[in-house]
Curated annotation (Swiss-Prot):
GO terms for cellular component: nucleus. Involved in the biogenesis of the 60S ribosomal subunit in the nucleus. GO terms for biological process: ribosomal large subunit biogenesis. It is found in: Nucleus. This is Translation machinery-associated protein 16. Residues 27-37 have a biased composition (Basic and acidic residues). Gene3D superfamilies: Translation machinery-associated protein 16-like (1.20.1440.170). Belongs to the TMA16 family. Its main location: nucleus. It comes from Xenopus laevis.
Length: 196
């Protein structure tokens, strides 16, 4: 004879809050939250890098086989001024008479903070851009189809404002070599004092 099923519905067991099972479920939930947070942070970082690379790719001169460091610095300067039109439009909206509140204030703040951060990087140890100084890396970058999975194939290089100065601009009078040469010549011309 077949078994008669009871009318009791299966209820989920209530887990005691201090049990090992509750601790395990809490750990799993925290682990999943951490994974989701890291995944979203990585996606945000990749999208920012992707936008930067897309801007550089669209502003490259197609006739150039490679760029000098000075030309790369000029390209970076134009990159740092990419928001100028948008800031002008925001200023124009805010300058209209009769407006008591500033429109697009949060966007304006974000743009100014981004520009300031990138300017500090450029003036400091360098801003990271695709390696357009090397002709082979430039060709790979031009052939890139904006696929983020192929991002590791693109070589990056840090370029700072000091790279825009030519070699002759860096050799300022009074450099270390000149000072050492002057000190050496002064030592030779000094009279020797003999003790008696």
């Amino acid at each position: 004879m077949p078994k008669v099923q009871s009318n009791k519905s299966k209820q989920e067991k209530v887990i005691h809050p201090y049990s090992r099972k509750a601790a395990q479920l809490t750990r799993e939930a925290h682990k999943q939250d951490r994974k989701d947070r890291l995944k979203s942070e990585k996606a945000l970082r990749l999208s920012i890098i992707g936008e930067k690379l897309q801007w550089f790719q669209s502003h490259l001169n197609p006739e150039k086989a490679e760029y000098t460091k000075k030309e790369a610095c000029e390209l970076i300067e134009s990159y740092l001024h990419r928001f100028d039109n948008e800031l002008e439009q925001i200023e124009l909206h805010n300058s209209i008479k009769g407006r008591q509140t500033r429109r697009h204030e949060s966007r304006e703040t974000v743009i100014k903070q981004t520009i300031e951060r990138e300017r500090q990087l450029y003036n400091g140890y360098g801003i990271e851009i695709p390696d357009i100084v090397n002709s082979r890396n430039l060709k790979v970058f031009r052939d890139w189809d904006l696929d983020m999975k192929k991002l590791p194939n693109i070589k990056m290089r840090k370029i700072s404002i000091s790279d825009s100065l030519s070699k002759s601009d860096k050799d300022v009078p009074g450099s270390n070599d000149e000072i050492e040469n002057e000190l050496g010549s002064n030592e030779e011309s000094m009279p020797d004092f003999q003790e008696s």
